[in-house]
């Protein structure tokens, strides 16, 4: 689909005139080491300072001519026009990205020539940095906050607000960095996690949020100062993080089209428009990264199905590539890619550097040698110290000259990284006392070296060639300005104009809607259904006074439904915030442009929804049947939607975290509802809070709709006093009776609508259009606040990486303590390996034969695994390898019995016997994702696994002692009591991986250990440490099967056996690897492959042999070759032997029943341990507990103060009823707070603990429910105290002499409400995947229950069809019990405006006239002795009011009992629904053994 264009048709003459003087290529001359073949490098080295303008112009013209000539020379293969390049129709053309013959290098040369000839070449920028020091501020306290100790941080918080950095100490991150990266060069940044690689890349690219750069630091970007480059040219230096953040519902093609269009230069070659250019660039980049086939596939994320993880990573890379930034920083961007794709990524960067002069700084973990060889320079960082910077091909020699030795088959990047690991670096004989040991010593040696002096000389040369703000800076600015849209400021970092940005974001917004139309359609259907249900409750109201309350309730419901239809936009804003901020850093668009576009994108939905909902409600309820009134109703309703949308969007944009937004939003919603004027009319609002009504947009909308409905109409009276139906009053008429409705005039049989709303609500016709104007002003103001706040307020950033401890387990010295972190000498003794002696070993052999796995994908059967054979024996370490998509993890899941769908066939045996129900518990499965409970400590996580998964017969003390053994084995002593936390504030990546392995080891798996991708995303040093650990375990007798992603040669050599899979899950090889991989390589050579060259990585060589590496090809069917080989026959023979031996030695399960139980621990112990952990999670999440407490206290106090000392008048009784009604509305907020914590625990349980048979699903559900009860009990006390006494319910009880019982029962009922809420939340979330979906489901049921509980419409006023809903609604019984307990057995005192006025018959007093009536119908007179103007109150006792609502004080305990039954139903329902929806039933799973 073509991208939209706006104001993009600037003429070619305008573009030409503006870009006539633009420098097309790299205008800088050579430094001492020239950039690698960048276009335009062949230039004079006479870079003069700014001189006369004419001389400068002549010089620039000369440069342009030279560069054009240079481009022609380097692009001689392409002689066509620009149209030939962008419209290459030849399917075999190497310039056509859709062609199988597409050649990236040929295209790049042609592109450079085309753009150069038209004076619109590529900007280039190098970097010189000198004396670079980067630091941050770290808090002295790094203990875990919990409910008990969170208050201890308050003094520090106050102090920090006064002086932000006063209570923090400076932590140096990088110290003393110097270097030059010339334009067109590539620099690889090496170092272990935490060494400062990311900080370095962020600093040089301007991503300095949370870190600070010393004032003494010198930056020079080809003459551009750092401040200007990072602000005015932000999109020219970009930082690409390792995380993949995209709109999941957007297709890959649309994602990349957007990126290409956002940075599309305006000065394009003749005949090429912006859409053609953008789509062509998108296709080229997708072809370069091998993702052309995903163009119409959704990107997806962890929850939404889309492209694979590796493809999503390449989408991230492609998006950054399309930014066309001349200076690019890539932070571990190859994470998740195998070595072949990592190499292709680096080759593409090399191509860009050579032909476009782009400069790249790249940090790579486990960099293949081939990738490293593509770089010009290397930077090695050791704990924040620069220990080498210079030519990449000289780095290895530098460290060898320092006295270190590079082992055979170790790659150069691994060798360089090993310099930062004392346990890995190898010292040459005779150099033991000469080599540096600590980071400071390495840094000092670097500063003393000859290489450093060369760097210093290069820096000085660079400074003289590119003086700050010199001619090269001017040329850069001109080139950039020529690419910008017409009218853009030079200092603006954006290519497109603001309106073009809005238009582009608008296009993307509609593409996102098209990507997930189901959500929008479902919302429209759901809202229309709610409209039908609500309308049926007030169906076909008559123009009579008896429906006044229903008519007001209908309009109130309409106002609230329209006003709060946009409440969930808060969640939407936070979900897309990281994406918007990332793309703003790329200078794609202003955040406010996306905000403005999002408002417009939502308009069609808002308009459609508003029409469907309001038309349904208006006509079904029989509101004012006047055309003008109807369209006014639609207008006000729609403006209400927009006004409140602006409010919710503003709240989201003004707060940095979702938790910051939710509590204010909850209170705001409550305040807007109460002060709208229906629940509490204006006259009844207390003075301290009257101002809220003036700021409430809902109030203005409600008043306008009430005036629209009632003004200018007369309503027939349906209730007179005295009533003609009472004997003796049948003939009463005229002035001797009056309508009992507010606004009635004695003698009239109708009530004027204006009089009613004037007296009851203080609403006036003159305010009708005034309020519309106020609403429009509020709408504009709210949206302006939203747009401005979006531009300037960013989301909260993570802190620096720091360990967090329980306060009682804090280490004696803080991490930042200089003494604690002082350098220590390298230990000279080898580590004792005897610690593995106590680790559980395996004695069983696990073997499988002819394993196949078939599954239906989009209705089509697909085979994922195809006749896979193999075994794992005790004491062996077996590698499972294969290309991406070969089914490695799938095979692991099949073998570990973790597949719940599809069809699995084949034999999977343990010592010749079929796997039983205990198999999962008796094996360990180390997953690729490191899933742990954030609030637990390392020791607690290990102990939890040990207590529940080790046999019940093992004493508890022995299990705890075994946990200590595991901690020692994994070298986790230093952080054994640290909290898991989240990345950045807790364990780092390596520590999490060790914990993941430790949790499985703590279970003492007696059979074997499955390990999935243990080194994925880790640096080579950490990967080596993880393999060290696995090797220790195998030597201790463990059987280990491990999938691994293209290991280095040295890592690969550490495995004993290999199972190698090709695409489609077909076996290529299974057998020994052999010394120096000779057994493996000999097999392939024997069957027709080339010899493995010396020094080549066998893991990479295998991929090339089978034709799986990019650019490789083979004519040999290696799967069939394996099936025909003698090695395969030997495997089959061994499998038959294992099966036969196992069957002969089989042991009856009855002899050792405990070993074969599904769960190791009994049910009671499971429940105790699991519940304790949930309690700990809640205690250590003070934000949840205090947010819940704040909500209950603030809502309770707010209601208590708003309805303070509510009188026992008719309106006072209604206010007390609404106080109870509004209290129930905290249901939604409590549910939204609770569900995310449940989802966190459930994710951990379902992904790791349930498949491992740690504890049963019944225990999981019950532990979650039990842990909520004490906290909700505490909250009920807060809510009770804050509402019961301020509102005055206690005074009603005192009047009746029932203080103790009614006070106690009121607390019990409030407690019951909160327990009902939490148990219902568990039932709702049990069947949904996300907290948002669960919250929506719960709110739908809550709204239905609230509608039909008898408050908005009494049961006798409901349509007969809905009586069943009244009876099944749990709130029917709750409201009845609470209201009757609160107000029963008290006398009513009508307010003056509630009294009905009429005259008695001639010659009688009011008392004599009404005596018979009062005896029959109730009520009382305030002036019984008067002979005129009788003042009559229709209700004397609160029990009469209760009866009208079908409530009775006598039913209070019955209703309480019914409420308890609902709670039991919730609990049983939660358990049943979880079992029904989320527990695997294995219906489709078939196995043959």
Curated annotation (Swiss-Prot):
Alphabetized SUPFAM superfamilies for the sequence: P-loop containing nucleoside triphosphate hydrolases
Comp. bias (Polar residues): 819-834
Biased composition (Acidic residues): 44-53
One GO term of the biological process aspect: zearalenone biosynthetic process
Ranges in a coiled coil: none
ABC transporter domain span: 152-408, 846-1088
Positions of transmembrane segments: 513-533, 552-572, 599-619, 628-648, 662-682, 773-793, 1190-1210, 1218-1238, 1269-1289, 1307-1327, 1333-1353, 1457-1477
SMART domains: AAA
One cellular component term from this protein's GO annotations in UniProt: vacuolar membrane
Glycosylation positions in this chain: 7, 70, 73, 118, 332, 469, 714, 1402
Region annotation Disordered: where it falls in the sequence: 1-55, 811-834
InterPro entries: AAA+_ATPase, ABC2_TM, ABC_trans_N, ABC_transporter-like_ATP-bd, ABC_transporter-like_CS, ABCG_dom, ABCG_PDR_1, ABCG_PDR_2
Membership in a protein family: Belongs to the ABC transporter superfamily. ABCG family. PDR (TC 3.A.1.205) subfamily.
Chief subcellular location: membrane
Topology with respect to the bilayer: Multi-pass membrane protein
Keywords assigned by UniProt, alphabetized: ATP-binding, Cell membrane, Glycoprotein, Membrane, Nucleotide-binding, Repeat, Transmembrane, Transmembrane helix, Transport, Vacuole
Originating species: Gibberella zeae (strain ATCC MYA-4620 / CBS 123657 / FGSC 9075 / NRRL 31084 / PH-1) (Wheat head blight fungus)
One function term, GO molecular function aspect: ATP binding
Role, per record: ABC transporter involved in zearalenone production.
Induction of the gene: Expression is positively regulated by the zearalenone biosynthesis specific transcription factor ZEB2.
Gene name for this UniProt entry: ZRA1
Binding annotation for ATP: 882-889
Disruption phenotype: Results in the loss of zearalenone production.
Name under which the protein is recorded: ZEB2-regulated ABC transporter 1
Location of this chain's protein in the cell: Cell membrane; Vacuole membrane
């Amino acid at each position: 689909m073509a991208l939209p264009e706006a104001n993009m048709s600037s003429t070619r003459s305008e573009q030409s005139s503006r870009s006539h003087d633009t420098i097309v290529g790299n205008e800088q001359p050579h430094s001492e080491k020239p950039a690698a073949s960048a276009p335009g490098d062949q230039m004079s080295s006479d870079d003069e300072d700014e001189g006369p303008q004419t001389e400068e112009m002549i010089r620039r013209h000369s440069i342009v001519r030279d560069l054009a000539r240079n481009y022609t020379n380097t692009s001689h293969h392409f002689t066509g026009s620009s149209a030939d390049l962008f419209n290459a129709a030849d399917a075999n053309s190497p310039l056509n990205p859709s062609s199988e013959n597409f050649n990236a290098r040929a295209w790049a040369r042609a592109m450079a020539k085309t753009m150069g000839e038209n004076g619109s070449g590529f900007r280039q920028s190098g970097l010189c940095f000198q004396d670079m020091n980067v630091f941050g501020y770290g808090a002295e306290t790094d203990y875990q906050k919990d409910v008990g100790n969170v208050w201890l941080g308050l003094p520090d918080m106050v102090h920090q607000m006064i002086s932000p950095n006063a209570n923090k100490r400076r932590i140096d991150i990088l110290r003393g960095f110097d270097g030059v990266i010339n334009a067109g060069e590539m620099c690889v940044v090496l170092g272990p996690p935490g060494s400062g690689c990311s900080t370095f890349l962020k600093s040089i690219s301007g991503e300095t949020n949370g870190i600070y750069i010393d004032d003494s630091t010198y930056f020079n970007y080809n003459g551009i100062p750092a401040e200007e480059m990072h602000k005015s040219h932000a999109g020219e230096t970009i930082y690409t993080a390792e995380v993949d953040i995209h709109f999941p519902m957007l297709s890959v093609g649309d994602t990349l089209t957007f990126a290409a269009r956002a940075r599309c230069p305006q000065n394009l070659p003749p005949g090429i428009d912006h859409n053609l250019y953008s789509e062509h660039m998108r296709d080229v980049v997708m072809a370069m990264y091998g993702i052309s086939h995903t163009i119409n596939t959704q990107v997806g994320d962890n929850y939404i199905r889309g492209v694979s993880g590796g493809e999503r990573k390449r989408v991230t890379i492609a998006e950054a590539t399309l930014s066309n930034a001349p200076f690019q920083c890539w932070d571990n961007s190859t994470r998740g890619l195998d070595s072949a794709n990592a190499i292709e990524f680096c080759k593409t960067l090399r191509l860009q550097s050579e032909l476009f002069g782009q400069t790249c700084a790249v940090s790579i973990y486990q960099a293949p040698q081939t990738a490293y060889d593509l770089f010009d320079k290397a930077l090695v960082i050791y704990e924040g110290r620069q220990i080498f910077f210079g030519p990449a091909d000289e780095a290895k020699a530098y460290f060898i000259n320092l006295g270190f030795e590079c082992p055979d088959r170790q790659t150069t990047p691994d060798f360089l990284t090993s310099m930062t690991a004392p346990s890995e670096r190898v010292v040459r004989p005779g150099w033991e006392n000469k080599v540096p040991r600590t980071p400071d010593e390495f840094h000092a040696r670097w500063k003393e070296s000859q290489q450093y002096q060369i760097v210093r000389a290069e820096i000085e040369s660079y400074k003289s060639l590119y003086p700050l703000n010199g001619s090269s800076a001017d040329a850069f600015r001109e080139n950039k300005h020529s690419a910008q849209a017409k009218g853009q400021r030079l200092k603006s970092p954006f290519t497109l104009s603001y309106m073009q940005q809005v238009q582009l974001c608008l296009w993307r917004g509609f593409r996102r809607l098209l990507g997930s139309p189901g959500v929008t359609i479902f919302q429209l259907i759901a809202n229309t259904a709610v409209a039908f249900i609500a309308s049926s409750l007030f169906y076909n109201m008559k123009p009579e006074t008896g429906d006044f309350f229903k008519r007001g309730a209908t309009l109130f419901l309409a106002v609230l439904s329209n006003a709060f239809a946009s409440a969930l936009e808060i969640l939407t804003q936070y979900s897309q915030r990281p994406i918007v901020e990332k793309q703003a850093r790329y200078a794609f668009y202003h955040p406010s442009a996306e905000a403005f576009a999002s408002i417009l994108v939502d308009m069609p939905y808002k308009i459609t929804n508003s029409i469907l909902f309001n038309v349904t409600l208006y006509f079904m309820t029989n509101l004012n049947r006047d055309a003008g009134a109807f369209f006014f109703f639609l207008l006000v309703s729609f403006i209400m939607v927009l006004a409140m949308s602006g409010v919710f969007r503003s709240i989201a944009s003004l707060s940095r975290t979702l938790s910051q937004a939710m509590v204010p939003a909850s209170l705001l919603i409550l305040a807007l509802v109460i002060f709208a004027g229906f629940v509490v009319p204006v006259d009844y609002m207390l003075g301290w809070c009257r101002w809220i009504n003036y700021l409430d947009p809902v109030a203005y909308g409600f008043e306008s709709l009430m005036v629209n409905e009632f003004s200018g109409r007369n309503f027939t009276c349906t209730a007179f006093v005295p009533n003609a139906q009472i004997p003796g009053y049948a003939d009463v008429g005229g002035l001797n009776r009056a309508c009992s409705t507010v606004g009635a005039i004695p003698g009239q049989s109708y009530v004027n609508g204006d009089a009613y709303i004037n007296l009851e609500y203080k609403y006036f016709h003159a305010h009708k259009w005034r309020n519309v104007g106020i609403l429009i002003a509020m709408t504009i103001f709210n949206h302006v606040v939203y747009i401005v706040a979006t531009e300037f307020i960013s989301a909260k950033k993570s802190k620096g990486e720091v360990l967090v401890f329980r306060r009682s387990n804090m280490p004696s010295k803080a991490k930042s303590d200089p003494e604690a972190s002082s350098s220590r000498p390298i230990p000279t003794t080898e580590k004792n390996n005897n610690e593995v002696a106590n680790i559980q070993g395996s004695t069983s052999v696990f073997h499988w034969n002819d394993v196949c796995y078939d599954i239906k994908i989009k209705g089509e059967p697909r085979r994922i695994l195809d006749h896979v054979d193999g075994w794992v024996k005790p004491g062996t370490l077996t590698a499972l390898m294969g290309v991406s998509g070969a089914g490695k993890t799938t095979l692991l899941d099949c073998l570990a019995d973790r597949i719940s769908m599809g069809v699995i066939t084949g034999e999977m045996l343990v010592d010749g016997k079929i796997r039983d129900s205990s198999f999962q518990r008796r094996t360990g499965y180390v997953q690729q994702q490191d899933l742990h409970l954030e609030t637990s400590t390392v020791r607690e996580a290990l102990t939890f696994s040990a207590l529940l998964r080790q046999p019940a017969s093992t004493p508890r003390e022995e299990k705890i002692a075994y946990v200590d053994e595991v901690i020692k084995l994994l070298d986790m002593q230093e952080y054994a009591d640290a909290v898991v936390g989240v990345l950045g504030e807790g364990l780092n990546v390596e520590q999490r991986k060790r914990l993941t392995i430790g949790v499985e080891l703590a279970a003492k798996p007696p059979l074997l250990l499955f390990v999935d991708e243990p080194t994925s995303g880790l640096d080579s040093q950490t990967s080596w440490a993880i393999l060290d650990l696995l090797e220790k375990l195998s030597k201790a007798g463990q059987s280990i099967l491990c999938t691994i992603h293209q290991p280095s040669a040295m890592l690969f050599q550490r495995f004993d056996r290999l199972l190698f899979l090709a695409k489609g899950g077909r076996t290529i090889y299974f057998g020994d690897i052999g010394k120096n991989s000779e057994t493996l390589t000999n097999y392939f050579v024997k069957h027709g492959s080339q010899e493995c060259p010396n020094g080549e990585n066998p893991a990479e060589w295998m991929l090339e042999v089978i034709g799986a590496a990019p650019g490789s090809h083979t004519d040999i069917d290696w799967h069939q070759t394996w099936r025909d080989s003698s090695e395969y026959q030997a495997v089959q023979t061994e499998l038959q032997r294992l099966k036969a031996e196992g069957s002969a030695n089989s042991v009856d399960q009855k002899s050792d029943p405990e070993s074969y139980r599904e769960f190791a621990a009994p049910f009671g112990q499971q429940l105790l341990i699991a519940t304790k952990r949930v309690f700990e999670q809640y205690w250590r999440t003070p934000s949840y507990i205090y947010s819940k407490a704040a909500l209950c206290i603030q809502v309770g106090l707010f209601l208590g103060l708003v309805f303070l000392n509510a009188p026992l008048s008719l309106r006072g009784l209604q206010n007390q009823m609404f106080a109870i009604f509004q209290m129930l509305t905290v249901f939604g907020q409590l549910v939204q707070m609770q569900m995310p914590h449940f989802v966190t625990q459930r994710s951990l349980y379902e992904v790791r603990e349930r498949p491992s048979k740690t504890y049963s699903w019944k225990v999981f559900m019950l532990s979650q429910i039990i842990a909520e009860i004490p906290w909700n009990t505490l909250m009920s006390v807060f809510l009770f105290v804050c509402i019961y006494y301020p509102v005055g319910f206690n005074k009603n009880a005192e009047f009746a002499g029932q203080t103790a019982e009614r006070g106690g029962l009121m607390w019990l009922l409030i407690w019951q409400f909160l327990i009902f809420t939490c148990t219902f939340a568990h039932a709702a979330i049990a069947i949904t995947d996300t907290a948002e979906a669960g919250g929506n489901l719960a709110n739908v049921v809550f709204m239905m229950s609230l509608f039909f509980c008898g408050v908005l419409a009494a049961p006798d006023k409901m349509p007969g069809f809905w009586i069943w809903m009244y009876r099944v609604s749990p709130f029917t019984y709750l409201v009845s019990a609470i209201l009757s307990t609160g107000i029963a057995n008290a006398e009513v005192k009508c307010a003056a405006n509630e009294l009905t006025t009429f005259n008695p018959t001639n010659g009688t007093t009011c008392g004599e006239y009404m005596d018979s009536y009062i005896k029959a119908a109730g009520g009382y007179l305030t002036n019984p002795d008067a002979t005129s103007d009788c003042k009559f109150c229709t209700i004397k006792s609160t029990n009469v009011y209760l009866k009208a609502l079908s409530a009775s004080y006598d039913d209070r305990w019955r209703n309480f009992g019914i409420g308890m039954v609902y709670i039991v139903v919730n609990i049983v329902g939660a358990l049943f629904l979880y079992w029904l929806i989320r527990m695997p039933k294995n219906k489709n799973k078939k196995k043959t053994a």
